Structures are given as structure tokens and as C-alpha cells.
């Protein structure tokens, strides 16, 4: 569960290390985002010579959350930290690699590029 002001790790090689959620997209009163939801983020930490700089504003899709995800078969999955992948205006990943596992709920949200780049889909 991600809300405004939440800090997330970045799970790609776009150059950002940590981002902060500044808006949850999808309705004027929407407050909370989960896995597969698109949010607007500000880059808080970045590596030198990366594609993005500190202070840049981008869209991002959430790929891992510390709050467990319940599945229809009764299982649940959770991670140690929250993580996101930065997107451009066309909702395509900025980076060319994805680090760490992602959940298969992204497939239903049509993020096939992220699914194919990820080393593991849980």
C-alpha cells in the first residue's frame, strides 16, 4: 500500500536509486496504490551519469510492496521493501534491466515489457 510521501526503491537501471510518491493516479479521491498501479514520483536519490537526475518527476509502476498481496487461490505474497519501475509518458520502462522479482499481477495490467525483463516472476 503506497500513499503520498512514501519512499520506494527503484528496481531498474534508469539511474534513480530512491523515489518518493507525489500522486496516486486513477481518480481524484484515490489515496492508496498497490502492485500494478501507476503513481507519479520524484527522484530523491540518483547515481551520477544516469538517465534521470535528482528532482526529476516521472511516472512509475509499483512492482513490489511490503503489504501482502492476496490472490484468489488463497495464497499471499509480500516483500521486505516497496519497489517501483520508472516509466516514460507512453508507460514504457525507462531502464533496460529490471532487478529483483516482480509479481504476476503485472501481466493483467498489460506491463508485458516489465514481465519479460524481470529475472523472476512470482
From Swiss-Prot:
Keyword Cytoplasm on entry: no
- Example GO biological process term? translation
UniProt key word GTP-binding: no
Q: Which protein family is it in? A: Belongs to the universal ribosomal protein uL14 family.
Oligomeric state and interaction partners are given as: Part of the 50S ribosomal subunit. Forms a cluster with proteins L3 and L19. In the 70S ribosome, L14 and L19 interact and together make contacts with the 16S rRNA in bridges B5 and B8.
Kindly provide the name given to this protein in its UniProt entry.
Large ribosomal subunit protein uL14
What UniProt keywords apply to this chain's record, in alphabetical order? Answer: Ribonucleoprotein, Ribosomal protein, RNA-binding, rRNA-binding
Recall the GO molecular function terms of this protein's record. large ribosomal subunit rRNA binding; structural constituent of ribosome
**InterPro entries per UniProt:** Ribosomal_uL14, Ribosomal_uL14_bac-type, Ribosomal_uL14_CS, Ribosomal_uL14_sf
Q: Which PROSITE patterns match?
A: RIBOSOMAL_L14 (PS00049)
Q: What does this protein do?
A: Binds to 23S rRNA. Forms part of two intersubunit bridges in the 70S ribosome.
A single GO CC term for this protein reads: cytosolic large ribosomal subunit
Amino acid at each position: 500500500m503506497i500513499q503520498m510521501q512514501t519512499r520506494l526503491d527503484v528496481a531498474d537501471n534508469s539511474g534513480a536509486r530512491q523515489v518518493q510518491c507525489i500522486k496516486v493516479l486513477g481518480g481524484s479521491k484515490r489515496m492508496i496504490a498497490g502492485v500494478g498501479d501507476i503513481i507519479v514520483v520524484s527522484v530523491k536519490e540518483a547515481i551520477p551519469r544516469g538517465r534521470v537526475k535528482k528532482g526529476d518527476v516521472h511516472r512509475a509502476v509499483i512492482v513490489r510492496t511490503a503489504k501482502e498481496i492476496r490472490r484468489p487461490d488463497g495464497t499471499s505474497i509480500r516483500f521486505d521493501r516497496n519497489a517501483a519501475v520508472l516509466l516514460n509518458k507512453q508507460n514504457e520502462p525507462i531502464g533496460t534491466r529490471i532487478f529483483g522479482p516482480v509479481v504476476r499481477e503485472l501481466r493483467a495490467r498489460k506491463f508485458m515489457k516489465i514481465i519479460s525483463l524481470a529475472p523472476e516472476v512470482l
